[in-house]
A protein has these predicted regions:
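Conserved small-residue
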Residues: 1, 5-74, 192
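Residues that define the transmembrane beta-barrel architecture of outer-membrane proteins
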Residues: 76-80, 87, 155-160, 176, ...
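Repeated loop/turn-to-beta-strand initiation elements of outer-membrane beta-barrel proteins
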Residues: 90-94, 171-172
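Membrane-embedded beta-strand positions of outer-membrane beta-barrel proteins
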Residues: 95, 180-182, 220
């Protein structure tokens, strides 16, 4: 899926944190809208990325701007949803499910926080920054911001909410009833994405360091 650019690059856009002047996306002829614009990463036998090792696309024995390629895209191939309301005797169950398939995201949280150089290890006051456990896998000494390694599969299936209830008929008399229910918002998401949340804004660049909350609610409806 890697394609070498023609002489006209296209519209290069969308900056990233940690790398001033680097734009990570491109709109170009013959490529999907909002493709990522990166160097094609090379890997060792164990499947780990090799620092500074990229495919020399034009064969000139150096890695530079001419080796950047359009790679993957931020838009999904398929977006779907499913809602349902089920009931059995006094029980009722409802849920809302969504899926986004074929979309990718640039994990800027990892690319900006994995390297072991001073600028990524310490803040401006000299204190250690929070480290990502993934830094032990890449072991990059300096930031590899333009690596295709950070363009990750962000397809997902998310349960937005699910609710289970039970209705007590004839609570005190024939005219009174009560329904007890429990609802969970954002109970789970199924994804291969390494970041906190695969559901990225339209830019396709993930700078999210805060998890989406999971909310539990217990309710009671009374009918008189």
């Amino acid at each position: 899926e890697m394609c070498i650019r023609d002489s006209y690059k296209g519209v290069i856009h969308t900056g990233i944190d940690g790398a001033t002047g680097y734009n990570i996306m491109i709109n170009a002829v013959d490529h999907p809208y909002n493709s990522f614009y990166v160097w094609e990463q090379l890997y060792d036998k164990a499947g780990n990325p090799i620092e500074g090792a990229y495919v020399d696309q034009n064969g000139d024995n150096k890695i530079d701007e001419e080796d950047l390629v359009a790679y993957k895209k931020s838009a999904p191939d398929v977006f779907m949803g499913l809602t349902s309301q089920l009931s059995y005797k006094n029980w009722d169950l409802s849920f809302a499910l969504r899926a986004s398939i074929g979309n990718y995201a640039y994990n800027n949280v990892q690319s900006n926080r994995e390297a072991w150089d001073g600028s990524q290890m310490y803040d401006q006051t000299g204190f250690l920054k929070n480290r990502l456990t993934s830094a032990w896998k890449t072991n990059f000494k300096t930031g590899q911001y333009r690596s295709s390694y950070y363009v990750q599969n962000a397809s997902f299936v998310r349960m937005d909410n699910i609710s289970l209830g039970y209705t007590f008929n004839k609570l005190f008399n024939d005219k009174q009833s009560a329904r007890v229910y429990v609802t969970v918002q954002n109970p789970f998401v199924i994804t291969k994405y390494d970041g906190l949340d695969p559901e990225i804004s339209g830019s396709g660049v993930d700078n999210n360091i805060y998890p989406r909350p999971r909310v539990f609610m217990l309710g009671l409806n009374l009918n008189f």
